Amino acid sequence: MAHKKAGGSTNNGRDSESKRLGVKRFGGESVLAGNIIVRQRGTKFHAGTNVGLGKDHTLFALTDGKVKFEVKGPKNRKFVTIEAA
């Protein structure tokens, strides 16, 4: 009788769905209050003036204006601020 040996099993074959993280509004772009600026895990970018921080570390605009990225402080942290238009 013709036989074929059974194939082995594997623990691979899955992948998680991408989370679409990253900068959503870049420096110089106009934003409205409530617009999401950055989606991130942890505080790669910190909230500056007129920017709110969500519970998942999402940065969002608190007022209308232009987005500005800057490096400040002794630890050279990246801050996102909104300058009033």
UniProtKB/Swiss-Prot annotation:
Key words, A-Z = Ribonucleoprotein, Ribosomal protein
Q: One GO molecular function term? A: structural constituent of ribosome
The UniProt annotation puts the region (Disordered) at 1-22
What highest taxon heads this organism's lineage? Bacteria
The Gene Ontology biological process terms listed for this entry are: translation
Stored Pfam families: Ribosomal_L27
Q: What is one GO cellular-component annotation here?
A: cytosolic large ribosomal subunit
Query: InterPro entries given for it?
Result: Ribosomal_bL27, Ribosomal_bL27_CS
The transmembrane segments are none
Q: Which family does it belong to?
A: Belongs to the bacterial ribosomal protein bL27 family.
What is the protein's name according to its record?
Answer: Large ribosomal subunit protein bL27
Annotated source species:
Photobacterium profundum (strain SS9)
